[in-house]
Amino acid sequence: EFAGKVKLIYIDPPYNTGGDANIFTYNNTFNHSTWLTFMKNRLTIARDFLSNDGFIAIAIDHYELGYLITLTDEIFGQENRLGIISVVNNPMGRNQAKYFSTVNDFMLVYSKNNEFAQFNNVILNGDFLNTFDCEDEQGKYKLQNFIRVGGGDANLKVNKQTFWYPIYVSPDFDKITLDKKENFFEIYPITSTGQERTWKLSKNSTEKILHELIAEKGSNGVISIMEKYRVEKGQKVPTIWSDKKYNANHNGIRLLEKIIGNKNFSFPKSLYTVLDTVKLLTGPNDIVLDFHAGSGTTGHAVLELNKEDGGKRQFIMVEQLTEHINVCNKRIEKVLGLNNLKSSFIYFELKKYNQSFIEQIENTKEAIELLQIWEQMKVKSFLNYNVDIKKQDEHIEEFKALTLAEQKQ
């Protein structure tokens, strides 16, 4: 039903650290090959859920980063890898670290098809947003010099002649034109140091945005052409997210405790890490999927963003661990209540997929039949994460020595 309809998949899978960050009953100490199989099966299916312009964002730490990149390049295509984001989620670092004190984890972002992928024009950095200190009837903006100062020598007059032309300003600074007029000031893109550079746009393009240009006279008498940079243009999103809102202690652990009183959930993501990902990659009517729902941060983020921008995004969260399900459901119900949201939250339990195998095991009369059922289960059943298939197969002779009743157990 949802194949090809999901705009964003956000997942925070078990990191396979082998350390103290064990996530409840997840087997967080897989060997690399088992962990990769665990991930590959899910990611291969996940790709089919994405729309052609869809994205997947995967949180991971350094331990499996290299392995995961190789796997996701294979599934989604290296050409669709849009970025590896470093999220500073623990700015104080890990005091017990033997070598480097880790302050970040990572987020891999892939598109399903980069020909259709498009980021939203958003500003994720609060400090940058505060620089938009002007406002008119069209909204917030800030003034930027219209001279192209970046790009080194490439944007010098001698190397880009078509971007060197005069802009004319009326004596009262009220009118700006590209047509030469009597008594108008003639302004060229020359810096305060006398360097001849270029304007940001060609003459034809500048003609179309003259209404967004302002002339200012400095204390030194120099006239500058300034551009209204609109907040709607957003910003190029950097690959390092270091804003304090991404702190997983303040906006993950403590936030969850504040909402539902839970102090025992290990390392929930900062709400704003997920919220900003959803803000960047989805529209107001899109579907977001998270099949490692954990504490329900993704659902919470979607609800908060809908409240912020009036969107009608929907989320689907999938979780199989009882500890997580209880936390997740309670959190979403609380958020809906606290925000007086009219959104509905529907909770389903999947039909016991393995029930047919249980019935086959109970009805079998021969040990050989049990072994045949086991081979089918390895391919078709949903086995618990703690089941090590390889180890089970290594002890097959010991299994054969058991009585039929013991084998069924």
Each predicted region: which residue ranges?
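Accessory, often C-terminal, charged low-complexity segments
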Residues: F2-A3, K7, D20, R42-R47, ...
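Conserved proline-anchored active-site loop of SAM-dependent methyltransferases
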Residues: G4-A21, T72, V288-L303
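Mobile active-site "lid"/loop adjacent to the S-adenosyl-L-methionine
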Residues: K7-I9, P13-T37, R42, S51-D53, ...
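Phosphate/oxyanion-binding active-site loops and adjacent basic polyanion-contact surfaces
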Residues: N31-M39, F265-S270, H324-N326
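Glycine-rich adenosyl-nucleotide cofactor-binding module
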Residues: H250-N285, E304
